[in-house]
């Protein structure tokens, strides 16, 4: 079977059962994302995070390879996470795994989108693979 060439990988993650204290802390999420970029072998260019009142955070880290972004709902223990990278140097899956661990997520619904698949007629398409994971039981880190 031939490997499909792609311009980038986009991970769209629904993280549930997360620690509300982490999800409500913009500074902590910034630290997590900056470290996730390192773990995923990405070069950070800029970051911006905003804390909503009374709760929730939205933020983005721009990396040379593309971006890592999040929107959180601490009251629901939920975070919507995107990690998109171009090229072959970065490892977005490692970044996603690190973020889920730091958010103390119990469950994740993950879609990996292979983007920029070139077709014969100079157009591009994408391919999606989706899975769900139970990450933690009873908050003790065992899966």
UniProtKB/Swiss-Prot annotation:
InterPro entries: AdoMetDC_C, AdoMetDC_fam_prok, AdoMetDC_N, S-AdoMet_deCO2ase_core, S-AdoMet_deCOase_pro-enz. The modification Pyruvic acid (Ser) is found at residue 66. This is S-adenosylmethionine decarboxylase proenzyme. GO terms for cellular component: cytosol. Binds 1 pyruvoyl group covalently per subunit. Catalyzes the decarboxylation of S-adenosylmethionine to S-adenosylmethioninamine (dcAdoMet), the propylamine donor required for the synthesis of the polyamines spermine and spermidine from the diamine putrescine. NCBIfam families: SAM_DCase_Bsu. Heterotetramer of two alpha and two beta chains arranged as a dimer of alpha/beta heterodimers. The active site is at 66 (schiff-base intermediate with substrate), 71 (proton acceptor), 86 (proton donor). Keywords: Autocatalytic cleavage, Decarboxylase, Lyase, Polyamine biosynthesis, Pyruvate, S-adenosyl-L-methionine, Schiff base, Spermidine biosynthesis, Zymogen. Is synthesized initially as an inactive proenzyme. Formation of the active enzyme involves a self-maturation process in which the active site pyruvoyl group is generated from an internal serine residue via an autocatalytic post-translational modification. Two non-identical subunits are generated from the proenzyme in this reaction, and the pyruvate is formed at the N-terminus of the alpha chain, which is derived from the carboxyl end of the proenzyme. Belongs to the prokaryotic AdoMetDC family. Type 1 subfamily. Pathway: Amine and polyamine biosynthesis; S-adenosylmethioninamine biosynthesis; S-adenosylmethioninamine from S-adenosyl-L-methionine: step 1/1. The record marks 65-66 as: Cleavage (non-hydrolytic). The keyword Aminoacyl-tRNA synthetase does not apply. Its cofactor is pyruvate. Its EC number is 4.1.1.50. GO terms for biological process: spermidine biosynthetic process.
